[in-house]
Structures are given as structure tokens and as C-alpha cells.
């Protein structure tokens, strides 16, 4: 069984962003190589202009604050410049950055007014703008970014077609999506989003009913707009006939099965995650490790947040099967101790069979509030009017869930 959910709004970038080409479709997974080639560098004539600003490679009023901008990128023989919204920067002509080593460039800006919000972009050879939204800096601080200048889209593949678990004693495929900045910039490390039912995420030929969650499209769109941080996505296929057992924490006698959820989560934490972290440049802490699923996948995701060692710090439960085993999840939540995720996203539709479990989902959101979660801060609860328990409904709400769990790109 599956459920559905809604995303209401997304954050817009408020200040002008240098336009670049929109994302193109990702193909099969390429090698983990970084850095641009000369053929890939083009001037972006659509850059933001500021007729009132002039180039000043020095500093301004010494009474202001100092902000350090640091860029990590393997530029080779190229040079990095920076343009921005406030003096001593401007949008017309770049100020050269100082090369600290082969992968690090920096510039110190002195004299910025306290509280001033600087928008800025690295520019390669003062000709090729970085992709994606403007970066922001405010106050006396050091801001470090890992940009990209060439790639518009990430790539995905069924990276491990025969991943074998010794804990579960079975084999399944694992899909991997790598975002564009990761593929271009060898200094970039990324948060990781683990998702259940991997068959339904990427490939229409493998998806239930031929309808996917449009994961590559959503990730590539966000990489361009900055709606949420770029991330590696790990799509873990379900094990077919073992799906119900693996996605449930207890046996439900009314269904006649279930109860291997703890073992399934151990597989994710003890077998799959170490392989992912050793294969890719990941940010492996709980705040950068997201777990998302729908229906029974939403049930096991919510359960994962309060069990184990707190590996998954951000939980997405879409149309979760709260009804399982007389709503055992709600009982477990009320008994949960110190292990709790930092962020929780819960949603459903309100139409179709059982109204997509909207009543149970509302009770789940209430249970999180009773634990101290605050709506809009550490909890987001969404009901999508008219939505049913379908892949297309989950696909439509996925960007909103990721926006909350990953946070916007800076």
C-alpha cells in the first residue's frame, strides 16, 4: 500500500541571480572526475549588471567588518575572480582572488557595513560565471563554497545491480544519483538522501505503472535554482516479496507478516552506508543523512528516526502506513528516548481509498509535536488536497520535502 502528499511553497532567491543554462537530462553515471576543460568555458552574457558600482581591488572604510570568501575548485591554469553586489565588488568586473593552493582561492573584503548582506559569485577567468544561484555572505565571517562552472545536470545509474546483504541474506539493486557540482568539482562533498523503493525513483521501465518519482529532474532543477542543497541520492530497491516484512517494525497479525524492519535498517546502516561513504565524497553526519519513503516506506522511515544510533537525522514520511499493527508507530514515538531526528517531514493526500490515511497521518504529526517538534522549524506537515496514494503524487511533493530536509542552497 502507498500514500500521497503535498508541498505548498518553496523559497525564492530574493536577489538577482546570474542566469545560466537550465538543467539538461542526466544520463548514465560517469566517472568521478572534476575540473573544466577549455572547450567547456563560455562567457555568460546575461550577467547581472550594477551601473552604480566600480571595480576596486583594494579595501574601503577600515571601520567596517571583514568577510573572507573562500572558493575550493581545481582551476588548473585558469584564474578565479569574484563579482558581487556591494563594494569593493560589483557585477560588471571581477576582482581577482588569491590562490592559496591548487584547490583553494580566497579574498578578504574589508569595510563592509555591519549587517550588510553581500550577494556574490565566483567567475572563472572573469568570463564564466558559476552555475546556480548567487552565494550570500553577511557579517564578519568566512564563507567557503565549492562551485561549478560547466555542468548543468547530474547523472544516475543502477550503480550496484546486485548488492548482497549478509544480514538479510538477499540481493537487490541500488541506484545512485550524483549531482552536477559533485561531478565537476573534485573538492565538493555532499549530503546523502537514502530512499526506499528504488525501482520507482529513476527509471520508468522499472517503476510501478511506469511512473517514477522524477528524482533526477527534481535534483537537477534544484541545482539550477538553489531551492535546496545538491545531494547524492541512493535509491534502494525493495526486495519484492520481502518488502512488507522489511518495511515494518513489528508483526501485524491482521496482515499475517512483517517484523524485519530492524534488520532492514541495520542493513542500511551497517552494510550499505559504509559502502556509500567509502565510494563517494559524502557528508556522513546525521544532519546530512536523509531517509525518505512512502507508504510502508514512510512507516519504516519514521521508525528509523527513533531507533538505532541516530544515523538518519532528517526523516521524510510520505503517506506513511501509520495503521500498521494497531498504530504501533505512535506508541513507539511516545516511548522514544534520546534518539530523535533533527527534522521530520510528514505528509499525505486526502482522496482515494481511506483518504490516503490522512487521519492517521495527522495523528503522527501531532505525536511529533507532543515530543517538542515545532511546525515550520523542526517539523513540516503537509496535506495535498485531492491527492491519492500514487507515485505521481509523491513525485509532485518530493521537492518540497527535500527543501525542508536539506535546506536551501546558500
Task: Give residue spans per PLM region.
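A short, amphipathic beta-strand motif
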Residues: 65-73
